[in-house]
Each structure stands twice: as structure tokens, then as C-alpha cells.
Amino acid sequence: MEGSDFLLAGVLFLFAAVAAVPLASRLGIGAVLGYLLAGIAIGPWGLGFISDVDEILHFSELGVVFLMFIIGLELNPSKLWQLRRSIFGVGAAQVLLSAALLAGLLMLTDFAWQAAVVGGIGLAMSSTAMALQLMREKGMNRSESGQLGFSVLLFQDLAVIPALALVPLLAGSADEHFDWMKIGMKVLAFVGMLIGGRYLLRPVFRFIAASGVREVFTAATLLLVLGSALFMDALGLSMALGTFIAGVLLAESEYRHELETAIDPFKGLLLGLFFISVGMSLNLGVLYTHLLWVVISVVVLVAVKILVLYLLARLYGVRSSERMQFAGVLSQGGEFAFVLFSTASSQRLFQGDQMALLLVTVTVTLSMMTTPLLMKLVDKWLSRQFNGPEEEDEKPWVNDDKPQVIVVGFGRFGQVIGRLLMANKMRITVLERDISAVNLMRKYGYKVYYGDATQVDLLRSAGAEAAESIVITCNEPEDTMKLVEICQQHFPHLHILARARGRVEAHELLQAGVTQFSRETFSSALELGRKTLVTLGMHPHQAQRAQLHFRRLDMRMLRELIPMHADTVQISRAREARRELEEIFQREMQQERRQLDGWDEFE
């Protein structure tokens, strides 16, 4: 592509994403499917704006690369070791069983056995990008099914290496392609990367961080990710696996969160580009001429993978309510199939079967498009199962009256609130997206609804029209603000109370008219500060008064700075306000010191 062509392609990608994704979200089909449809629209079989799909698809794999780096940052080596059973047990079983079944079905359609084996392995793989994105959207990261799904995806990435090595063997050209000296050098280079990364990365980032220039730190992070990907690609290995290893090596470093912050914006954009590129690669000509064959193929592929995954989840001991989530999210074909089929085609494994190869490729792409829809069906099934009428023995002491309070989110923050309310005999209903948490809470008598709390129908089913208050404890600030807007629009009678992760979220809540909120660490930090004052010799009564004064004045400053909380030009005004409030605090505390102590020295 010429430079101007790349610029035009970039503009088209951005326009397609901006137009299609909000529309898809509004229709309730999800952002991933929106990206895929946008790709179909601008690709060679749609409006034809872009024709060089293969080059863009290869570039867009960087989205998966960045995603795997961030996942690596979240997994330290000890955590990875804990997952070894699920990675090499369930992961290996899924690939082998799915590949065997699918290869057998391909042989029934007159594929040569060598081509059928390659086809079965390629189809057994799932889309890392799509599965991880959907798991995050569905809140599966913390659940047992999400952990198991990640283990299977990681094994599939590891299986890329032997799968590619198998192709020349099946093509009968092993002697030409297997230079054992080269293979040995690649293994040594890979080991060298592991050792070098283990002992060099932290000192290098410590040196860069010492410069104090944030842009250089971001550039170094990009260099690490892209360099790892390029190095692994040169070795003929998975780029995503290389960046995942780099992430794991830095997972226990002090720079973990800064690295994640630097990479996150690039990850989102490039993942979107990847899904658009997959949509562009869909050959609608083959779909039109072989519609029935393609539809049957997609159904068979998805059904076989769901069957294998469901049975493995059952054998592994996954709860019945989570098995369909696990099976559904990994039911599609993956991007690795395109790479494997291309390699096999260059080795003439599919000679005489080019149309069949095209049909299989179209099947993989369409199977990706079915996954978001399939997960919506799974969500509806889970909603009916968990949000329908409950049996009496499932809820020992929760009565059938309408709730007084709805608690959204039941993580560590929400659990404390829920327990306090339940201890005081308040009628509460909990909305939670983590199905394993739903199962656990029902055992303890909580009235729980599974699903996304930003859905008006779910709020209505949970009793929002009759409840007095709603307590929002979402992890993501965006979800909190969206839920506040929905409640103000559809349930204006509700008293809204919310969790704020910090001052920025507190400002946003105040601007939205929510005055009852709690900053996540503010109260506990104040309490620890009070105890610190006591250990430094301040009388407990004065320390308590100092804590109360500080809380009141900090809240006053928070309200005064609302109009300028996002205005960098007026940061100096914020500093002046802080100094003024500190002076007021000092004067009031001097007045306090003149007063007699109000109670004894013991807490």
C-alpha cells in the first residue's frame, strides 16, 4: 500500500467503527459484531473501498498482540503455574478431541486425510481476540468459566508451533523444510529471550522511568511489545505468545500498572481494526453460491465445539450454570485457521480442493459472527433460569415483598453494604453479572438477579419501580454513570447512592446530581490517618475532631472545584483553593486545641 492509501484506509476504518459500533450497541448485538459488519460493508465484497485485505489483516493482528501483553501483566508466574492443570489438561483435550471429530467430518466430505487433519486442527482453534473481548464484556474474568476459557486459549496459542511444524510433514516435504540446525538456533533464541527478559527488563524500565518523561516510557512499552512480536514472528512462532511471555515477566514489577495504562488505548483501537479486517475477509461470492453448504458447515462447527467444550467443563467440575458460557464463548473458529490454511495451501496440501478451502475459510469467519449472538442467547437462558420464580427451599428467609434497596454489583465493596443492610432486616435485591457469585449468594439467601444492570427491563424485573433506593457499586466508572442516567430517566423516584473510585468519579457524580456517594478509599484512609495522629501524641478527641474537620473541608473543596475538574488551564485555581482550605483547617484546629478534651484517652 502507498502512504496515501494507508491514510485513506485509516480514515475508512475510523469512519466504519464510529458509524457501525454505536448502532450495533443500540441494537443490542454488541460492539464485536458491529466491527465485523463494518468490515463487510467497506471490504471487497461490500462497497469495495478496500481491496488489500491480507496486508491489513496481518497488521491488525497487533490488536491481539497488545491484548495478550495486558493479559500477561495480569498473570504472575505463580498464578500461571496454578493454571497448569487446566492449560495442559482441558486445553490439550479440547484441541485433540475437536480436531479429531472435525477431521473425521472433513474426510466424509472427500478431503484427503492429510488436508482433513490440517483442517481439523485449524477449526479446533478459537479466536483469542473475540473470546477474550466477550469474556470481558460478560464479566467472566473472575469466574471459573472465564479462568478455564483463558487456559484453553493459552494452550491453543502454544499449539500453534507444533501445528505449523506438522504441515510439511503431512505434505511429504519434511526433509526440505526441517533443518535441525535452524530449529536448534530458534530454540536457543527463544530461551535467550526468556533469560534476557527475566533479568534485563526491570533495570531497563527503571532507567527509563528515572527520566521522568512519560512519553519515553510509553515509547519503550510500545518498543517492548512490537519488538517481542517481531522477534517471535522471525522465529516462526506466535506473535501473541511472545508478548504474553513479556507481560508475564513484568507482572510482578513495580511498573505493571503504568505499562497497562500506556498500552490500553492502542489495544482497543487495534482490536477493533482486527475485527473489521476479519469482516472484510468474508468472501460473499462463495456464500451466495454455496449458501446451504456454508450454513450447514457453520452449524456443525459450532455444535461440535460446544459439545466438546461442554463435556470437558462437566468433567472438570465447572458449575452447570457456567458450562454454557464457557462452551459458547469458545465455539467459533479462530484467526489461526487463516494462517494454517495459507501455509497448507502453499505446501499444496489443498491441491484440487481450492473451492473447499474457500468454503472452510468462509465458515470460520461466519462462526465468529455467530458467537456474540450465541452469547446473547446464553444470557437470556441464564436470566430465565436465575431471574425467574424461585423455589421456597432456595431462599430460606428472604420474603417475597418488593425490595427496599437494589444493590448493583456484589464485589468486595458491594458485599459490605449488602451484609450491613441484611443484618438490619432490610429487603434488598442484588444485580450481578458474575454467574459464580450469583450461585454463591443464592445459597446464603440473597435475592439475586443475573444480568447487565444497565438494561431497563432487568431493573424493572428486580423491582426498581417499587424500591426506595439503589446503591451502585460497579467496578467501571462508565457503567456507574450510565446507570445513574438510566435511573434518573426511568426511575426518578429512586434515591441514588454510588461508589466513586476517586475524585474524578466523585466530580462526575456531583455534576450528574448524585450527592450520596462514597469514595472508595477515602474513609478508610481518614481512619488510618486519625490513628496515626493518636500515635504521634494527639489526644484521641482532638484526632477525631481533626478527622471530621478534614472530611468536611475536603468535601467543600470537592464541590468548589466541580466546574474546573477537567480544565487543565485552571489547575492553579485548584491549588489556590486547596491552600485556602488548608488555612481554614489550621484556624479551626487551633480553636479546637483551646477547648477541653471531650472524652478520655482510650478508644
UniProtKB/Swiss-Prot annotation:
Give one GO term, molecular function aspect.
glutathione-regulated potassium exporter activity
Could you tell me which PROSITE patterns the record lists for this protein?
RCK_N
Topology versus the membrane, per the UniProt entry? Multi-pass membrane protein
Does the keyword section mention Ion transport? yes
List the Pfam families hit by this protein, alphabetically.
Answer: Na_H_Exchanger, TrkA_N
Signal peptide (UniProt feature, chain positions): none
- Residues annotated as domain RCK N-terminal: 402-521
Q: InterPro entries recorded for this chain?
A: Cation/H_exchanger_TM, K/H_exchanger, K_H_efflux_KefB, Na+/solute_symporter_sf, NAD(P)-bd_dom_sf, RCK_N
Query: What is the recorded name of this protein?
Result: Glutathione-regulated potassium-efflux system protein KefB
State the organism of origin.
Shigella boydii serotype 4 (strain Sb227)
Could you read off the lineage of the organism from its UniProt record? Bacteria, Pseudomonadati, Pseudomonadota, Gammaproteobacteria, Enterobacterales
